[in-house]
Every structure is written in C-alpha cells, then in structure tokens.
Amino acid sequence: MAAWGCVAALGAARGLCWRAARAAAGLQGRPARRCYAVGPAQSPPTFGFLLDIDGVLVRGHRVIPAALKAFRRLVNSQGQLRVPVVFVTNAGNILQHSKAQELSALLGCEVDADQVILSHSPMKLFSEYHEKRMLVSGQGPVMENAQGLGFRNVVTVDELRMAFPLLDMVDLERRLKTTPLPRNDFPRIEGVLLLGEPVRWETSLQLIMDVLLSNGSPGAGLATPPYPHLPVLASNMDLLWMAEAKMPRFGHGTFLLCLETIYQKVTGKELRYEGLMGKPSILTYQYAEDLIRRQAERRGWAAPIRKLYAVGDNPMSDVYGANLFHQYLQKATHDGAPELGAGGTRQQQPSASQSCISILVCTGVYNPRNPQSTEPVLGGGEPPFHGHRDLCFSPGLMEASHVVNDVNEAVQLVFRKEGWALE
C-alpha cells in the first residue's frame, strides 16, 4: 500500500472499558423482521453503520446479547431500519446469501445478501481476471464463491492435486503407491485467488508455490522461476480472529504470512499482490460505502450519507481500516483521490461521504485487561503489529475515535451524536 497511508495519527479520543464482555447467548426464537422494506422515511439519515460481525454481533455461532438490544434501536416499529446498515466481515468461506440468512436467524431481523460484504466481495471489480484460468484456495463453497465473483474459469486446489498427485507429499497416507503417467493435457493456470484459510495448509502452500514457480504449469517445472510471478488476488488479512475460545484463533492473514515467507525464502524475492481485499483495505470500505448509498436510494432517503460509523472489535483491521479510509476521504476532498497499491481504489463514482468514524468494542479481539491486547506496552513501547506486510505501520491508525463496551453502546453513542432518539 502506498506510503501516504502512514501519515500522522488522527486526534482520536480513547475510551475505557469498565465492564467485562458479556456472556454470549444462544438463538432467540423470534421471527425475522425485514430490515429495509421500502416505506416512508422520517428524518432521512445522513449517516450509516458499517458493522463487523465476529466479536461485535456474534462469537462463533452465538449472538452477543448487546447485538439484539442494538437492533431493537436500529429497527423501527414497522420492522424497517432507521438508518442504512451494511455488515462488513473478513469471513470468506461462506456464500453471501448464506451469511445473510445466518445473520437473520441470529438477530431476529431479516438481512438481505446485498447488505453483507465478505472479505472477497470487491473481487467483482477485478474484471480483467474474470476470464483467466485461476487457481482458487480456501474452504467451503470456493467454486461457487469464485463464480459468484465473476471468475468463469476456476480450478480448485483439490482438482490440481488430483491432476498432479506427486505434488502433495506431506501426508504419507495420501501419497500414491505407484508413479502415475505425466499429464500434458491440463490447461495452464494464469493466476491465483486466495479467498480464505484452507483446511490442509501444507497442501495449499505447496501447490500454490508450485504454480507460482512454474508459471502456471506445475507438471513441467521451470529452471528459473519467473518474476514478476503470476497475478495473485487475496482477501482477508486478519492475523487473528475471535470465536468462542478464550484466545484469538489464526486467520487467513496467518496463512498469507506463511506463503509470503516461503516464497521469499525460496526465491529471494517478495511475493506481490495485484489486489488485497478485506479490512483494512480502502477498497473494501469504498465497496461498503457504495452499498450504503444504494441502500439509502432504495429507501428513498434523498439526503446524501455524509458520515460512516465503523464498529468493530479488532484494532488492526476494523479501527485501522476505518481510520485509513477516513484519511482517504479527507485527502480526496482536498487533493483528489490518491493512487494506492494492491489494496487500493477502483471506485468509479466519487465518494459522497466526508468521514468514517471508528468505534471499538470490547466483546471480541480487543480486551484492555488482556496482557496480549494490542494496547501499547508499559514503558511507552509500541504494540505488536498484527497487520499485513503491505500496510505501513502507523500506531495512530489503531487509535479508535471511541471505545465502548459493546455494539449497543456504540449505537447509542452515534444516535446521541446525531441527535436521534434512542428508541
């Protein structure tokens, strides 16, 4: 990402979490209410919410009680959202409509698929790769996700492994007992899609490396690896994420770190990305802003959405990304949109938003009482940098504008700031 992202820190006010994160609760047996059915608008909003999911609304498959309270404030008596809301998650191993259905069941409020942004959703904008033969890595419905993003010629890691069984050698139980005949009929791979963390990391790491080092023909091999290598598009840079366990779990950012380290060690060169998506990339926030705008148009809200409030639990992805996008909006307002790197902009329509305000909650990754928190260490030292290699570390960008206990308090805070009734 371009170096301008490392400008001085925002003058952000820090909050203090006085209460521990509340215990997660199970599904509420209430029928889902439609969240943005078209209807008459009263006091058209000029702000919208970008809500993280894991650690903000849910922990694993259990809803956080504060999320139910928050949505009772966000939804009016007719079952309509009072303000535009988009759910922005770095999850990617699920279909968009499936995630919407999951949220509907958890929140008791019908969520449509076009309110949900998965980590790889902005790949729809990379149309120059949609006709190329792409190797896709991840788990779950990877083929359906890739095709839904516009990629029409996709091969999975498992399909590649079956075509070239001699490539996957770590698991002794899966090694062939006989040597297969070489294949010359397998079409060359032209790029790599990294949609999310795979299940068998050793297999995916090995085969992705084989594709990159062989210029897309892993059955043949090359004496000298090509550089630049084949295009790589990746989503979800989260090193860690929060589920039901007491400590954070490895995210796709950890897998990317492994791949980058192996490539560097083997070739002596840096793995390069044509696109990095998911929080904290600016591209993801631009995509979210566009969905907020379209949602407001469907509701008939004529006033432009000027403020975005991004609520998350991870200082490195949610807070960093919101603050980075805020800087982008400020710079775009004064100087025009800057040029960015792999996580940069592809936006066609000028941004109407003027600010993106970060709100950090204490129900997920962030916990000030945890010694492994991303808070600055004692003695004035800097916290560990959990962000991606291509993000220039600026500690100030991890400083949230507001820190509250949970998403319900975040909604109350925003409504007070905007002069809206809490109920």
UniProtKB/Swiss-Prot annotation:
InterPro entries under this entry? CDP-alcohol_PTase-I, HAD-like_sf, HAD-SF_hydro_IIA, HAD-SF_hydro_IIA_CECR5, HAD_sf
Which protein, by its recorded name, is this?
Answer: Haloacid dehalogenase-like hydrolase domain-containing 5
Signal peptide (UniProt feature, chain positions): 1-23
The record's account of tissue expression is: Widely expressed.
Its GO biological process terms? glycerophospholipid biosynthetic process
What keywords are annotated for this sequence in UniProt?
Signal
Disulfide feature: none
Provide an example Pfam family for this protein. Answer: Hydrolase_6
For this record, an example GO cellular component is: mitochondrion
SUPFAM superfamilies recorded for this chain?
A: HAD-like
Enumerate the PANTHER family for this protein: CDP-DIACYLGLYCEROL--GLYCEROL-3-PHOSPHATE 3-PHOSPHATIDYLTRANSFERASE-RELATED, HALOACID DEHALOGENASE-LIKE HYDROLASE DOMAIN-CONTAINING 5
The UniProt family comment states: Belongs to the HAD-like hydrolase superfamily.
Top-rank taxon, per record:
Eukaryota
Misc note:
Candidate gene for the Cat Eye Syndrome (CES), a developmental disorder associated with the duplication of a 2 Mb region of 22q11.2. Duplication usually takes in the form of a surpernumerary bisatellited isodicentric chromosome, resulting in four copies of the region (represents an inv dup(22)(q11)). CES is characterized clinically by the combination of coloboma of the iris and anal atresia with fistula, downslanting palpebral fissures, preauricular tags and/or pits, frequent occurrence of heart and renal malformations, and normal or near-normal mental development.
Upper taxonomic classification of the species?
Eukaryota, Metazoa, Chordata, Craniata, Vertebrata
